[in-house]
Amino acid sequence: MTGLWRGQLRSAGARGYNGRRNAFGRGVHALDLKRINDHVSVSGQIQPEDVATLKSLGFTAIINNRPDGEAPDQPDGAAIEAAARAAGLAYHAIPLGRDGVNPELVARTKTALEGSAGPVFCFCRSGTRSTTLWALSQAGEQPAEAIIAQAAEAGYDMSHLAGYLGRS
């Protein structure tokens, strides 16, 4: 699945920021939540100051699927974790990097989702890695078509994972 994942990253084209640049070359931040279902939403990169908004929207946990140091304008996960903890939100660092998807990442995602007291917010650079880990964590829990449809409704094509998602 690693090769599949790398190809997907190259072709994704989505950005965690809205694409505009300011005078300092940093992305102009826009929080763009995409609802997968009543329990999970995803987006691209967030900033520590977004945590208060996430809390006000009713999220109880944050899953960070982006490795630190992936881009120069990316905040450290520790800063987002500190903001989450200060706001009373659970925080899970489950980075999906160049080594690709593996069973441990999927299991950790499933555990974090199942252990949450309420809605969970997941992020990476574009939301694609977060959606991929969510989809794979649902294998065997929901029909493959339902998983793929929920992701598609949020704007993510997970049809390439159908063989990994199990029952139809």
Where are the regions a protein language model picked out?
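Substrate/cofactor-recognition hotspot
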Residues: 127
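Short cysteine clusters
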Residues: 124
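Cys-dependent protein tyrosine phosphatase-like superfamily
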Residues: 5, 16-120, 132-168
